[in-house]
Amino acid sequence: HGIGRRQRQMCIRDSIDSQALISEMPEVIEAQAQIEKLQKTYQTEIEASMKEYQTKLQTYSADAQNQTEVTNQARQKELQGMEQNIQQYQQTAAQDIQQKQADLLRPLIEKARAAIQKVAREQGFDYVIDATPGGALILSDGKDLLADVKKELGF
């Protein structure tokens, strides 16, 4: 009985840095490349819009004294609209990139976790500690103690 307990303790000490594993997966590297490409595309479009905005701002500012009040107000409104459009586009881009990351990486993270569990099971481990900073236990086939602990506490 003491040997079984000692073996369990040894099994719990085995660990893996899941973050390192995931970051080295070829599919993850490919997904990251797709995400970076999308980020660059959005960045280029945002920079072009910002440049257009800056150019108009300079042109309108330099020409403001030669224009009527109505024209200057219309130009101011146009610039405000451009500013709002750029901000909205930046938000949309950030959300789109975040969604793309989730869509591409979630199945790969699940694939890595399943592989860790499979290897742990094959090697007879109940639990594997995730050595990633802030990582947790990765459950393989360990016993859930909830019912036993509830019984011990009398409920």
What is the role of each PLM region?
Residues 116-141:
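Extended, charged amphipathic interaction segments
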Residues 18-20, 27, 84, 132-134, ...:
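Solvent-exposed coil/turn segments that connect beta secondary-structure elements
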Residues 119, 152-155:
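Conserved, well-folded catalytic cores of nucleic-acid-processing
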Residues 106-109:
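Structured alpha/beta interaction-core segments
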Residues 93, 97-101:
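Long, charged amphipathic alpha-helices with heptad-repeat/coiled-coil character
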Residues 1-12:
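Single conserved hydrophobic/aromatic residue that forms the stacking wall/gate
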Residues 13-93:
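Early exported N-terminus immediately downstream of N-terminal targeting peptides
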